[in-house]
UniProtKB/Swiss-Prot annotation:
It is found in: Cell membrane. Channel that opens in response to stretch forces in the membrane lipid bilayer. May participate in the regulation of osmotic pressure changes within the cell. Homopentamer. InterPro entries: Mechanosensitive_channel_CS, MS_channel, MSC/AndL, MscL_channel. One of its GO terms (molecular function) is mechanosensitive monoatomic ion channel activity. It is a multi-pass membrane protein. It comes from the Bacteria. Its main location: membrane. GO terms for cellular component: plasma membrane. NCBIfam families: mscL, PRK00567.1-3. The lineage of its organism: Bacteria, Bacillati, Bacillota, Bacilli, Lactobacillales. The chain crosses the membrane at residues 14-34, 67-87. This is Large-conductance mechanosensitive channel.
Amino acid sequence: MLKEFKNFILRGNVLDLAVGVIIGAAFTALVKSLVDNLINPLIGMFVQSSALAHLSVTVGKTKFTYGAFLNDVINFVITAFVIFVLIKFINKLFPKKEEIVEEQKNEELETLQEIRDLLKK
């Protein structure tokens, strides 16, 4: 049982996932710092509140802190955009095997078509 567990842990997918989770947590802290320390003060220059997270509206006795929600939306959009760019970059570096095979087939097809055209002459 320990041997099976060792094989499971040492498989590439599990290690890749663990590294991804650790890097993701560190990246989330970095994005939060970017939003809290750079983006929020810039927005604070244009609104009355110095911190975006403290923006709110009160209706009756209920207080709606929409600033905290906006803060989370900014964090999400930045994180999603950076992940999107990273995935596009990684996909360019490591094309899928299917894409490589398809490119080879296209080259073979072009070569065969050229040979056919030459034989027609």
